[in-house]
UniProtKB/Swiss-Prot annotation:
Activated by phosphatidylinositol 4,5 biphosphate (PtdIns(4,5)P2). It is found in: Membrane. Residues 117-140, 160-168 are extracellular. GO terms for biological process: cellular response to morphine; potassium ion import across plasma membrane; regulation of monoatomic ion transmembrane transport; response to electrical stimulus; thyroid hormone metabolic process. GO terms for molecular function: G-protein activated inward rectifier potassium channel activity; G-protein alpha-subunit binding; inward rectifier potassium channel activity; potassium channel activity; voltage-gated monoatomic ion channel activity involved in regulation of presynaptic membrane potential. Keywords: Ion channel, Ion transport, Membrane, Phosphoprotein, Potassium, Potassium transport, Transmembrane, Transmembrane helix, Transport, Voltage-gated channel. The gene is Kcnj6. This is G protein-activated inward rectifier potassium channel 2. Residues 141-152, 153-159 dip into the membrane without crossing it. It is a multi-pass membrane protein.
């Protein structure tokens, strides 16, 4: 009985909601460790480690935004931009509206043609050869509906023909012809834009499954890989990245999805890509980087998401195309590097996309970039890149002194030689 109460109380603690669950508290709360039997009795759906809970994505791997708009009261705004609304609809609804619009217009004008014939009395003089109807051979609603289709689609079979003794029919013919042209232009244009949308072009723009953090040119860098599967290239391709992470301001305001720019070469022009073969996009982790204070041990505890956006123009159509993807904490590998995919063959370069997502482990410090910089400045970490750079700087200074004062250097060498001779004597 005591064990059951203990299990129930621990379950309530783990399932309890907290208003400040997204705000990091400076006070560490240590939960008592349960006996093994009590831990086994806990429900399996309860996680004992909150750091291992799944992070909710803001942008999915396929590029679709995981956001649903609710309680939208001003729905009339969608009707003010009816063309964009129709283009954004799914194909099944778009085709249904396409068929319904034409069917309704045919039925509407067919009903009007039948009413004109009925009011004029054409239905009562069908077999009277001396009677001049509004539309010849129109003897019911079905024939009026067929005449409406022939008029709007300009088929013109010639069996049903409007006569010159019916001015209201002539006016209706003009109205239906004009409205039919407008409907054709609107619906065909909508279908054309729907078909020519560059969304499917983004399907052949691929991103690596994981992002990696490793050393590159003596600096800690965050890297991911992008590629284009088509032979027709993306013109004016550019890449940018955003960090999505919760934030609490100094005034106490909580921002659940704060967006921070990640520099992937904006100031140097490296963000503009010539995407003929797969490229590795690199972000240098420096003082301006949001990853400046994140180490290997701290990375799994962070709840963050990196959204990458690749934009460019489709070479065939000239329309702007955008591809998106994202990386959560579990998809960022510390101490790994991408496997090369480009090889030189006989007269051409070959890309092996089987190795596009592959990574291999490499030697990488587990400290954060800030800690590495502090240790390098205090000369407590014998980093090869810092030592070599200091030696190079010392050699350059000596070379500059020799070029500026060659006479002083000659006198200095002469004095040294005289001192050596005196010491020998």
């Amino acid at each position: 009985m005591t064990m059951a109460k203990l299990t129930e109380s621990m379950t309530n603690v783990l399932e309890g909601d907290s208003m400040d669950q997204d705000v990091e508290s400076p006070v560490a709360i240590h939960q008592p460790k349960l006996p093994k039997q009590a831990r086994d009795d806990l429900p399996r759906h309860i996680s004992r480690d909150r750091t291992k809970r799944k992070i909710q994505r803001y942008v999915r791997k396929d590029g679709k935004c995981n956001v649903h708009h609710g309680n939208v009261r001003e729905t009339y705004r969608y009707l003010t931009d009816i063309f964009t609304t129709l283009v954004d609809l799914k194909w099944r609804f778009n085709l249904l509206i396409f068929v319904m619009v034409y069917t309704v217009t045919w039925l509407f004008f067919g009903m009007i043609w039948w009413l004109i014939a009925y009011i004029r009395g054409d239905m009562d003089h069908i077999e009277d050869p001396s009677w001049t109807p509004c539309v010849t051979n129109l003897n019911g609603f079905v024939s009026a509906f067929l005449f409406s289709i022939e008029t709007e689609t300009t088929i013109g079979y010639g069996y049903r023909v409007i006569t010159d003794k019916c001015p209201e029919g002539i006016i209706l013919l003009l109205i239906q012809s004009v409205l039919g042209s407008i409907v054709n232009a609107f619906m065909v244009g909508c279908m054309f834009v729907k078909i020519s949308q560059p969304k499917k072009r983004a399907e052949t723009l691929v991103f690596s499954t994981h992002a990696v953090i490793s050393m590159r040119d003596g600096k800690l860098c965050l890297m991911f890989r992008v590629g284009d599967l088509r032979n027709s290239h993306i013109v004016e391709a550019s890449i940018r990245a955003k960090l999505i992470k919760s934030k609490q301001t100094s005034e106490g305001e909580f921002i659940p999805l704060n967006q921070t720019d990640i520099n992937v070469g904006y100031y140097t022009g490296d963000d503009r890509l010539f995407l003929v073969s797969p490229l590795i996009i690199s972000h240098e982790i420096n003082q301006q980087s949001p990853f400046w204070e994140i180490s290997k041990a701290q990375l799994p505890k962070e709840e963050l998401e990196i959204v990458v956006i690749l934009e460019g123009m489709v070479e065939a159509t000239g329309m702007t195309c955008q591809a998106r993807s994202s990386y959560v904490t579990s998809e960022i590998l510390w101490g790994y590097r991408f496997t090369p995919v480009l090889t030189l063959e006989d007269g051409f370069y070959e890309v092996d996309y089987n190795s596009f997502h592959e990574t291999h482990e490499t030697s990488t410090p587990s400290l954060s970039a800030k800690e590495l910089a502090e240790l390098a400045n205090r000369a407590e970490l014998p980093l090869s890149w810092s030592v070599s750079s200091k030696l190079n700087q010392h050699a350059e200074l000596e070379t500059e002194e020799e070029e500026k004062n060659p006479e002083e250097l000659t006198e200095r060498n002469g004095d040294v030689a005289n001192l050596e001779n005196e010491s020998k004597v």
